[in-house]
Amino acid sequence: MPKRRWIITGLVAGLLGLAIGATAVAAPSIAAIACPQCYGLSSLGEGVYAERDDDAYQRIVTTAEQRISGFYGERTSDARVLICATEECYQSIGGGGEKGQAFGRWALRLSPDGANETIATHELAHIELHKRLGSVYESVPDWFDEGLAVLISDDARYLDPANGGNRCRVPYEEAAPIVDADWATFGDAGSDRKYLLAACVVTHWVDEHGGAAGVLTMISDMRAGKKFSELQ
């Protein structure tokens, strides 16, 4: 009987090893989030893991977190952040052509081109919104999720300076159709114009709803069961 137990234990361990290996091959992003060190990323503290031991990465994340707190009044999320200094690293953890990517409410990765305060804030803004919304976060339209992230990150590629007045870089009438568009298929391949349009619409929405307080009310209402379309 003891021998049989050892055989079963060995089989279970082997199967677990195969499962972990299969996950690493099929879903490197998930595997890297679970074990950053397995992909050559070292801990810089505070949940930040980077390919290169550089204090600048920690400062980038700290500044991004402060921007999130500055908008909402406080930060509720606590994401694991993976930062790559080379394209080889970024590809190994499942990255593609994007500068960064958030994963639900738990983690984000930054490419070499995305390791800056703007992109880090953008991705953390997604995570903060998702964390605050809880299980209903997928009910928020992509255009709002992305446009709000652009606004919070104050991305100069898509918004005019915050010196009062209209921040849209296109006429609002030109931007408005993004609300009814399919975010995943909108625009030409490789174009980021949809972020420009979403930023314009969301900036107007936030202004019309009382700023960050309006976003907090929206979150509260959605958690209480209201649909986003009912909050317009």
Predicted regions and their residues:
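C-terminal region of N-terminal signal peptides and the immediate post-cleavage residues
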Residues: 21-41
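Acidic/histidine-rich, surface-exposed loop or edge segments in extracytoplasmic proteins
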Residues: 38-54, 105-106
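Auxiliary, metal-adjacent structural segments of Zn-dependent hydrolase domains
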Residues: 53-104, 113
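Active-site-flanking alpha-helical
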Residues: 125-133, 153
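Hydrophobic membrane-insertion alpha-helices, especially the h-region
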Residues: 7-28
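Short pre-active-site segment immediately N-terminal to the catalytic Zn-binding motif
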Residues: 104-121, 134-140
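N-terminal Lys/Arg-rich, disordered targeting/topogenic segments
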Residues: 1-5
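Acidic/His/Gly-enriched intrinsically disordered linker/tail segments
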Residues: 119, 135-232
